[in-house]
Amino acid sequence: MQFTSFAILAISAVASARVTRRDDSSATGADKGGTCAVGSQISCCTTNSSGSDILGNVLGGSCLLDNVSLISSLNSNCPAGNTFCCPSNQDGTLNINVSCIPVSA
């Protein structure tokens, strides 16, 4: 009986252990939220200069690559429908003439 009580107490202690959040401020691609593929970054296209379609946001808009994460897009820091996974160079700049994939939240 005592062993069962101890086992139940130990299992509940392990199950209720608090998980610490890792700092992903320097993570990119698949490391940042597990949403984008390796070599891609989450970007937020905040303006639309060539119509109301998605390509207008990516090709003609202002896409921010820094300080954008899936969590910020879900917290309405990035307007709905304007969060994309865009391929990036090793220096973190956005590649020209490549397709960005919309992230659906």
Swiss-Prot record:
Record keywords: Cell wall, Disulfide bond, Glycoprotein, Secreted, Signal
Induction of the gene: Expression is increased during sporulation. Expression up-regulated by carbon or nitrogen starvation.
Cysteines joined through disulfide linkages: C36-C85, C44-C78, C45-C63, C86-C100
Domain of life of the native organism: Eukaryota
Signal peptide: 1-17
Predominant subcellular localization, coarse grouping: secreted
Keyword Isomerase: no
UniProt subcellular location: Secreted; Secreted, Cell wall
Disruption phenotype: Leads to the repression of hcf-4 and induction of hcf-2 and hcf-3. Decreases the hydrophobicity of the cell surface. Leads to very few rodlets, which are found in dispersed patches. Does not affect the ability of the fungus to grow in vitro on agar plates or in liquid culture. Does neither affect mycelium growth and sporulation, nor the frequency and speed of conidium germination.
Glycosylation sites noted in the Swiss-Prot or TrEMBL record: N48, N67, N97
Tissue: Abundant on conidia and aerial structures formed in vitro and emerging from disease lesions on infected tomato plants.
Family, per entry: Belongs to the fungal hydrophobin family.
Quaternary state and interactors: Self-assembles to form functional amyloid fibrils called rodlets. Self-assembly into fibrillar rodlets occurs spontaneously at hydrophobic:hydrophilic interfaces and the rodlets further associate laterally to form amphipathic monolayers.
Chain's role: Aerial growth, conidiation, and dispersal of filamentous fungi in the environment rely upon a capability of their secreting small amphipathic proteins called hydrophobins (HPBs) with low sequence identity. Class I can self-assemble into an outermost layer of rodlet bundles on aerial cell surfaces, conferring cellular hydrophobicity that supports fungal growth, development and dispersal; whereas Class II form highly ordered films at water-air interfaces through intermolecular interactions but contribute nothing to the rodlet structure.
Name listed for the protein in its UniProt record: Class I hydrophobin 1
Organism: Passalora fulva (Tomato leaf mold)
Species classification: Eukaryota, Fungi, Dikarya, Ascomycota, Pezizomycotina
Gene encoding the protein: hcf-1
